[in-house]
A protein has these predicted regions:
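Rossmann-like adenosine-cofactor binding region
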Residues: 187-284
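Phosphate-binding beta-alpha-beta segment of Rossmann-like dinucleotide-binding domains, i.e.
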Residues: 85, 91-158
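Glycine-rich Rossmann-fold phosphate-binding loop(s) that bind the pyrophosphate
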Residues: 164-165
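N-terminal Rossmann-fold NAD(P) dinucleotide-binding loop
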Residues: 168-169
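Oxidoreductase and adenylate-handling cofactor-binding alpha/beta cores
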Residues: 99-118, 176-180, 310-318, 323
Length: 335
């Protein structure tokens, strides 16, 4: 008898038809209602969608659950962690897209674009460092002006990446191609990402913070990373450094970040994710010239949806053929 794969909530007919076109020996159920899902989960071997404690309790033969998301902090629950089924996620979809977003932040800070855009909106010609600091032929070769000093040379900078999954690894790669020195920390130090000059364990995070001009958080939301960047941790960032978070909003305490910016410990911050989303309009970060805020769009690209579908189709094919699945997670660690 063919293994049963339950899809719930039901996916749209166009994507469902592509699953049916896989030519695999599976009984695929696209459940339109909770009642239908409850009926079919009892003997389903595979599941795609949003599993709940109620559905999991009814499952008697379940061996595989495919999350529709890469992040798992809102997906896993105690019963699922304890269940013997394999949980796979959708990691690996956004690596280049988010890395580009990070490098955009870095370039904006280094070339002061975040400030020049404000000047443009006000129709102001305001070179940072002052117009009177502009180089002229009366100044001899080798003289560094205030205008020069006000703009960063990226190849002289160090980027520290916190978390070297698919996204963090590609950030390291992109940064190295800009000539930056790249260091990183990750729980797994067995494989050094391309472009990284030194990879250490997460216990060496203070070392990374002290050495980096740009600290990039590319870590997932886990019990260990929640609230990790508090007052004490942010205080360990190199004075004048920049903090970039494209990982998860709950990793950075915004009150602590705001305080560090206010006292001048950090030169700036760029955030795509926040403790509360949307970020309230009255939050003080909106008004800061040294902050770049984007509304959780770092992963947006026309390529991501097709990769999402391709990953699902490939895992369904592997499930039907009893082959090793892609993106097997550690349920207890949420990634």
């Amino acid at each position: 008898m063919a293994k049963k794969l339950l899809l719930y909530p039901a996916i749209d007919l166009e994507r469902y038809s592509q699953i049916l076109d896989l030519d695999v020996d599976l009984n695929i159920i696209n459940a339109d209602s909770l009642e239908e899902a409850q009926f079919h989960i009892t003997d389903a071997r595979g599941f795609y969608g949003k599993i709940t404690p109620e559905l999991l309790t009814l499952a008697e033969q379940l061996t595989w659950v495919q999350s529709p998301t890469a992040s798992l902090e809102h997906y896993v629950f105690d019963q699922l962690i304890d269940h013997p089924c394999t949980l796979t996620n959708m990691k690996g979809l956004f690596y280049d897209v988010i890395a580009d977003h990070v490098m955009c932040y870095v370039l904006m800070f280094a070339r002061r674009m975040h400030l020049y855009m404000r000047s443009q909106f006000e129709s102001k010609w305001s070179p940072i460092g002052g117009e009177n600091a502009r180089s002229s032929f009366t100044v001899g070769p080798g003289a560094v002006t205030g205008m020069d000093q006000a703009h960063m040379h990226i190849a002289d900078c160090t980027m520290g990446v916190v978390g070297c999954g698919s996204i963090g690894s590609e950030i390291c790669n992109r940064a190295s191609h800009f000539g930056m020195k790249v260091i990183a920390v990750d729980p797994d130090v067995s494989a050094e990402p391309c472009g990284v000059s030194e990879l250490r364990g997460t216990n060496e995070l203070p070392w990374l913070l002290a050495e980096s001009d740009f600290v990039v958080i590319a870590a997932p939301h886990t019990p260990e990373t929640e609230g990790l960047f508090d007052d004490a941790m942010i205080a360990q960032i190199k004075p004048g450094g920049y903090l970039i978070n494209i990982g998860r909003g709950v990793i950075v305490k915004l009150a602590a970040l705001s305080a560090a910016l206010e006292r001048g410990h950090l030169s700036g911050a760029a955030l795509d994710v926040f403790e509360t989303e949307p970020l309230p309009s009255e939050h003080p970060l909106w008004e800061r010239e040294d902050v770049i805020l984007t509304p959780h769009v770092a992963a947006c690209s026309v390529r991501v949806p097709e990769r999402h579908l391709d990953t699902l189709l490939e895992n369904i094919r592997r499930f039907a053929s009893d082959e090793p699945l892609l993106n097997v997670t550690n349920k207890a660690r949420w990634y």
